[in-house]
Curated annotation (Swiss-Prot):
<keyword id="KW-0809">Transit peptide</keyword>
<keyword id="KW-0539">Nucleus</keyword>
<feature type="active site">
    <location>
        <position position="73"/>
    </location>
</feature>
<dbReference type="GO" id="GO:0021549">
    <property type="term" value="P:cerebellum development"/>
</dbReference>
<feature type="modified residue" description="Phosphoserine">
    <location>
        <position position="40"/>
    </location>
</feature>
<keyword id="KW-0963">Cytoplasm</keyword>
<dbReference type="GO" id="GO:0019372">
    <property type="term" value="P:lipoxygenase pathway"/>
</dbReference>
<dbReference type="GO" id="GO:0005829">
    <property type="term" value="C:cytosol"/>
</dbReference>
<dbReference type="GO" id="GO:0005739">
    <property type="term" value="C:mitochondrion"/>
</dbReference>
<dbReference type="GO" id="GO:0005743">
    <property type="term" value="C:mitochondrial inner membrane"/>
</dbReference>
<dbReference type="Pfam" id="PF00255">
    <property type="entry name" value="GSHPx"/>
</dbReference>
<dbReference type="GO" id="GO:0007283">
    <property type="term" value="P:spermatogenesis"/>
</dbReference>
<dbReference type="GO" id="GO:0019369">
    <property type="term" value="P:arachidonate metabolic process"/>
</dbReference>
<keyword id="KW-0575">Peroxidase</keyword>
<dbReference type="GO" id="GO:0051258">
    <property type="term" value="P:protein polymerization"/>
</dbReference>
<comment type="function">
    <text>Essential antioxidant peroxidase that directly reduces phospholipid hydroperoxide even if they are incorporated in membranes and lipoproteins. Can also reduce fatty acid hydroperoxide, cholesterol hydroperoxide and thymine hydroperoxide. Plays a key role in protecting cells from oxidative damage by preventing membrane lipid peroxidation. Required to prevent cells from ferroptosis, a non-apoptotic cell death resulting from an iron-dependent accumulation of lipid reactive oxygen species.</text>
</comment>
<dbReference type="InterPro" id="IPR036249">
    <property type="entry name" value="Thioredoxin-like_sf"/>
</dbReference>
Amino acid sequence: MSWGRLSRLLKPALLCGALAAPGLAGTMCASRDDWRCARSMHEFSAKDIDGHMVCLDKYRGFVCIVTNVASQUGKTDVNYTQLVDLHARYAECGLRILAFPCNQFGRQEPGSNQEIKEFAAGYNVKFDMYSKICVNGDDAHPLWKWMKVQPKGRGMLGNAIKWNFTKFLIDKNGCVVKRYGPMEEPQVIEKDLPCYL
């Protein structure tokens, strides 16, 4: 076997081993190619709404709700209103909310990141807004690819995100503990929070 071929075969195994090594998992962020090796949300990074790269390790020790959002959806008002309320009531207890704008469903998030930020400000959003991403397909953000295949992150009728405002509850260790469909309002998550906060 040639060195080049051996190198190609070993690279994924070495990368997974490095990500799993104690102390390294928190310092490495899974990329577009190695998301399958990740063991927690904390191994990923994403651009915030202002375009700054954020390593999601900053959420270690916090319970998180991760959701895809849209400004022009019929469920926009109820979701933003309830997410803002949950954040206001539980942030001091250790809840963090990560909102990822996405234009894949009915083109209901067509604006720029700046326009989305201004829209969210109208709801007095204090939780973390991230740059617009894809949540399905080859171009899906690695975090979303990873969340969808976790044992408690799988969907009904396939793992694809079905619509705006699909929500994932993430525990303090960065593991998916529950997935909520787009028709489930954020207040439904509240009953599950005491188990993890």
